[in-house]
């Protein structure tokens, strides 16, 4: 691209671990000049899903330009702050992560009034939308207006692309993209060659990582594990915390799994690569979920994955292809999950193949792919705008 770089503003509610490296790489892309605006950049936040205050042990704000309002500002003060920032910045393209947060709604309204092209980015699916339940019809109408008013969207998977199209987005204005995890970091922790589970009395190490809340389906994993043969060597490790911790511990005891299931508790960012690399298989038993980035992290760390069909990470050409780069089972059916676990317990060759394929597949879902696809969409959109309105 010749001339000045495209001025790009990215609006996000708060910093997140999986975006840090991606934003660093996007900021380094040629032809784009990126500034990130947060609604809050607080270093310690209360996370209801983990049932605790969380302070991540990595710097989420290093390596890219960003701004956020001072802590303690009122809502009206934050609104005035963002409007001043957008007026001063004069973005040529605005990337909006989601549309439900205050910063997203304000930025979208500002851009509609000032005719700044907006590119939508997120991981919503119709399954997630239906799960919201309330005001469904009104929400659908608002989304249709938003899709038609936006310059385009970045899809983060087949289900997300279908969501945009069903809301009225022209498929020609949807670019393929990535909802990234730091695949390089987790790949570095990948376990080396080890004795296949079942050979030499090596146990099958089954894992879960995430918030202990109802929709994550950890109870389903425990019920499935209870169906595995007690004569075989296997274990389950649950990494994470949340309001259901006591209930899940009681369920494990009730199912006779107290000696096989370990509740590791909350793990911070720098602890996760080694924990996931220690798993033979990661289970994502969500009752509904969007991109479930822990799936990418586990695959990069060398684990095979089993995901429920209520996640949005599977399907032809997506992250998990059933029987190729992972296994899929019907959500709500512990027996089906138990059968998939039994397959890996009985067939070390299948497990080894899935682990190798998973580690190779995630190369397409890392922060470099995010930066590359996002920058390509920005350049294309800017060139189209110039062709329509002139430089």
Please identify what each model-predicted range represents:
Residues 266-267, 274-279:
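Short alpha-helical donor nucleotide-sugar binding micro-motif in glycosyltransferases
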Residues 287:
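Aromatic "clamp/platform" in nucleotide-sugar-dependent glycosyltransferases that forms part
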């Amino acid at each position: 691209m010749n001339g000045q770089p495209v001025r790009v503003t990215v609006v996000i509610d708060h910093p997140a671990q999986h975006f840090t490296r991606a934003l660093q790489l996007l900021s380094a892309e040629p032809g784009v000049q990126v500034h990130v605006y947060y609604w809050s950049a607080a270093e310690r936040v209360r996370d209801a899903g983990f049932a605790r205050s969380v302070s991540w042990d990595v710097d989420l704000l290093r390596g890219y330009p960003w701004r956020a309002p001072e802590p303690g500002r009122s809502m009206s003060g934050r609104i005035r702050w963002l409007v001043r920032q957008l007026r001063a910045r004069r973005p040529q393209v605005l990337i909006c992560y989601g549309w439900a947060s205050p910063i997203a709604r304000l930025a979208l309204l500002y851009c509609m009034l000032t005719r700044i092209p907006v590119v939508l980015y997120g991981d919503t699916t119709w399954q997630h939308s239906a799960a919201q339940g309330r005001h469904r019809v009104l929400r659908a109408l608002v989304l249709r207006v938003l899709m038609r008013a936006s310059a385009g969207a970045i899809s983060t998977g087949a289900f997300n692309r279908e969501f945009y199209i069903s809301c009225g987005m022209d498929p020609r204005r949807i670019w393929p993209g990535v909802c990234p995890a730091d695949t390089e970091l987790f790949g570095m922790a990948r376990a080396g060659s080890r004795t296949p589970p079942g050979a030499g009395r090596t146990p099958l190490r089954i894992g879960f990582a995430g918030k202990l809340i109802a929709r994550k389906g950890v109870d389903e994993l425990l019920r499935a594990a209870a169906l595995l043969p007690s004569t075989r060597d296997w274990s389950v490790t649950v990494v994470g915390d949340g309001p259901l911790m006591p209930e899940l511990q009681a369920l494990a005891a009730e199912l006779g799994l107290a000696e096989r299931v370990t509740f590791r508790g909350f793990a911070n960012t720098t602890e996760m690569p080694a924990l996931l690399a220690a798993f033979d298989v990661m289970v994502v038993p969500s009752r509904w979920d969007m991109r479930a980035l822990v799936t990418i992290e586990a695959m990069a760390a060398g684990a095979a994955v089993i995901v429920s069909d209520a996640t949005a990470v599977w399907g032809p050409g997506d992250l998990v292809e059933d029987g190729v780069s992972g296994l899929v089972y019907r959500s709500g059916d512990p027996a089906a999950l138990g059968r998939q676990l039994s397959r890996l317990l009985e067939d070390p060759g299948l497990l080894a193949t899935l682990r190798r394929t998973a580690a190779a597949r995630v190369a397409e879902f890392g922060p470099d792919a995010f930066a590359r696809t996002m920058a390509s969409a920005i350049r294309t959109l800017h060139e189209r705008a110039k062709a329509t309105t002139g430089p």
